[in-house]
Amino acid sequence: MPLTLAVYGKGGIGKSTTSCNISAALAKRGKKVLQIGCDPKHDSTFTLTGFLIPTIIDTLQEKDFHYEDIWPEDVIYDGYGGVKCVEAGGPPAGAGCGGYVVGETVKLLKELNAFDEFDVILFDVLGDVVCGGFAAPLNYADYCIIVTDNGFDALFAANRIAASVREKARTHPLRLAGLIGNRTSKRDLINKYVDHVPMPVLEVLPLIEDIRVSRVKGQTLFEMADKDPMLSYVCDYYLNIADQILAKPEGVIPKESADRELFTLLSDFYLNADKPKVNAEEELDLMMV
């Protein structure tokens, strides 16, 4: 059975870029990897392929939903380093359920026996939406990975995703592998959160402009490093993540914080972060002046 990962995180946090570079890192470690984009924008695999590949839902519509008329090469495309790529797609804007499309994608790939040939399957899932449909990849995953930054909103979203992992772990052998901090110059708020809600931190990537450029170019950092070896140090971050995942860590079943409690914890940290610490004796001296 392939090792299956589900990557979640706040919308716009760099989740797809992170997913593509992790997939490339896993391929560099000799693994056969399938990345499945689960977002109606169907741009999850752009960094691997360099173009927006046709979606499964588009292909199904072309075939009048006759699954028997679809072959693996109709929906699976080649990406950098031999990573295979699939985009689920979605319904027209404002109509239908994107989560339903994720289910149809898994159904089709199973009928094609597409999962059997891979060592690792990575689901890159839409934003921080954790409704039943978009939480569906957690039903198939061995591990969930949450991409965040050092900000309030991303960690608040991470906490909600952690709650989904805990709920799914009741009935599935699912664990949270940990957090990845993406393009952040600090990690103090991440540390504050994981002290409050214990979970591993797999890696924290610094504020490196080439990570953003990777997305815009439609190239992984590994492909960019093939042309500019000075970027090899950035690839090492993703290789470190890949090595941890391939080691099959124990992971955790997280116990998320209550929303109001987390809101208070994180907002207090922001509001008081720059205030100097004053001990009781100093405070008394100030009062007597």
Swiss-Prot record:
GO biological process: one example: photosynthesis, dark reaction
Annotated positions binding [4Fe-4S] cluster: C97, C131
Pfam family, one: Fer4_NifH
Cofactor note: Binds 1 [4Fe-4S] cluster per dimer.
EC number annotated for this UniProt entry: 1.3.7.7
Reported cofactor(s): [4Fe-4S] cluster
Pathway: Porphyrin-containing compound metabolism; chlorophyll biosynthesis (light-independent)
Catalytic activity, reaction form: chlorophyllide a + oxidized 2[4Fe-4S]-[ferredoxin] + 2 ADP + 2 phosphate = protochlorophyllide a + reduced 2[4Fe-4S]-[ferredoxin] + 2 ATP + 2 H2O
Enzyme class: oxidoreductase
Keyword S-adenosyl-L-methionine recorded: no
Family of the protein in this entry: Belongs to the NifH/BchL/ChlL family.
Complex and partners: Homodimer. Protochlorophyllide reductase is composed of three subunits; ChlL, ChlN and ChlB.
Summary of the function given for this chain in its UniProt record: Component of the dark-operative protochlorophyllide reductase (DPOR) that uses Mg-ATP and reduced ferredoxin to reduce ring D of protochlorophyllide (Pchlide) to form chlorophyllide a (Chlide). This reaction is light-independent. The L component serves as a unique electron donor to the NB-component of the complex, and binds Mg-ATP.
The name this protein goes by in its record: Light-independent protochlorophyllide reductase iron-sulfur ATP-binding protein
Gene transcribed to yield this protein: chlL
